[in-house]
């Protein structure tokens, strides 16, 4: 059975989801029926075809009136600001992938269901009252048929949660800190401009900019036992894609660098294959652009202090890796039943 999806919001993640679907060869499993985006159709088609981070899309793209043609496929374009007015029932939508970055509450999810969708997957963290928050590879197997409003967490949560789980099971985590070194995002100005967050009034290309992050809360959402045991900070850096995460954890078992790297390498080749990758090469951020993994462990940067303090550096393409997990979670939601 082919899952019929709609994409609500055709920005960085929405376009990456569509491109990832075509590039990953999963069109027999998932079909994009419609896209709802307030921007004009000509701009939607242009930005799908030409992308500053991911290059030119390999499929032929053209737009006519309210239709987007991708290869031989026809996708309906909608420009409806009110979720309750979307024609999901008429179009037979199984799952809405809400990539707007605006919606994320249970009420928002229920509005999509009222419009006729069977299930909703938010491409960002949602409220505590959602049916589930999924980090694919860690807890997607817990999805049930009555989980109709689901969050796919965040790109950074998807990156770091598998590593935390692996280190905790092997060595027993007592507490930890996380520093996210994140590429610039579209909530930052090209030149100085007004913003509620005074640090984000500054030009994105000119500074390393500390910003707020809810990553610690995201860790606790997946692993409640770590409540008040993790803290996180985040800085934005003048690159347009790819993020690095510096994870430090104190553990109960004595350990050395070789043991940590062996554990993570084994997981990348085994239980987390396709989700976690592992590199021993002297790479830089641009080398991980367009990488579909949630996390890539840089073993050259693993450190252990006093046998009980572990520091790891983990890379991710915060757009492409997350977009691929959106597709994985969509299929997992479908497998759990409607």
Curated annotation (Swiss-Prot):
Top-rank lineage group of the source organism: Bacteria
Assigned keywords, A-Z: Cytoplasm, NAD, Oxidoreductase, Pyridoxine biosynthesis
Record: residues binding NAD(+): 12-13, 318
Signal sequence interval, chain numbering: none
Swiss-Prot/TrEMBL GO biological process terms: pyridoxal phosphate biosynthetic process; pyridoxine biosynthetic process
E.C. no: 1.2.1.72
Disulfides per UniProt: none
Marked site positions, Activates thiol group during catalysis: 182
GO molecular function annotation: erythrose-4-phosphate dehydrogenase activity; NAD binding
Biological or metabolic pathway of the protein: Cofactor biosynthesis; pyridoxine 5'-phosphate biosynthesis; pyridoxine 5'-phosphate from D-erythrose 4-phosphate: step 1/5
Binding site for substrate: 154-156, 200, 213-214, 236
CDD domains: GAPDH_C_E4PDH (cd23937), GAPDH_N_E4PDH (cd17892)
Location of the active site: 155 (nucleophile)
Location in the cell: Cytoplasm
A cellular component annotation (GO) from this entry: cytoplasm
Catalytic activity: D-erythrose 4-phosphate + NAD(+) + H2O = 4-phospho-D-erythronate + NADH + 2 H(+)
NCBIfam families cross-referenced by the UniProt entry: E4PD_g-proteo, PRK13535.1
Assembly and oligomerization: Homotetramer.
Role noted for this protein: Catalyzes the NAD-dependent conversion of D-erythrose 4-phosphate to 4-phosphoerythronate.
Family, per entry: Belongs to the glyceraldehyde-3-phosphate dehydrogenase family. Epd subfamily.
Name assigned to this protein: D-erythrose-4-phosphate dehydrogenase
